[in-house]
Amino acid sequence: MGMLKNKSGFTLLEILVVIIIVGVLASVAMPQLFRNVERSRATEALQSLGATKRSIEGCAMQFNNVYTNCGTYALIGMTDPSYNATTNAGAHFGYAIGIGASSFTLTATRNTVENGVATDTIVLTVGTTGAVIRSGTTAFAGIQ
């Protein structure tokens, strides 16, 4: 009689089942991951817009609540948080200030760097009463 040898290892079928399970889990988890990444980037934009809003309001107080003297980042004492490959390559939005005599609009537009969609925007409009209207085309324009 011959001696039986113990064989160890996985069969091809077991390996294929594990690969299929991992693939299914990844297909469920990846869209959620990308959604959370975009949500965090939209939060970045809202924080920058909020800081800009406060700086414009502080600047306008110096000019009897007239916003026309506060239309650039230099005039409000801020560095433009827009994407610049040499200074802040991590920024995911470009920013613009639109100024009227008694109101202003701040716009964050998603950069196409890192697969952003250039048509995604977040807009804050501050009217004469100081009320802030949030709008935009990105899925997270209305996040609180």
Stretches with model-predicted labels:
Residues 16-32:
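Alpha-helical hydrophobic helix detector
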Residues 30, 35, 72-75:
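Phosphate-coordinating loops and pocket residues in cytosolic domains that bind phosphorylated ligands
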Residues 1-10:
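N-terminal leader/signal peptides at the extreme start of proteins
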Residues 35-65:
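Membrane-proximal N-terminal amphipathic helix
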Residues 11, 28, 36:
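Ser/Thr-glycine-rich phosphate-binding loops at phosphate-binding pockets of nucleotides
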Residues 58-144:
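Periplasmic/extracellular, small/polar-rich flexible segments of pilin-like filament-forming proteins
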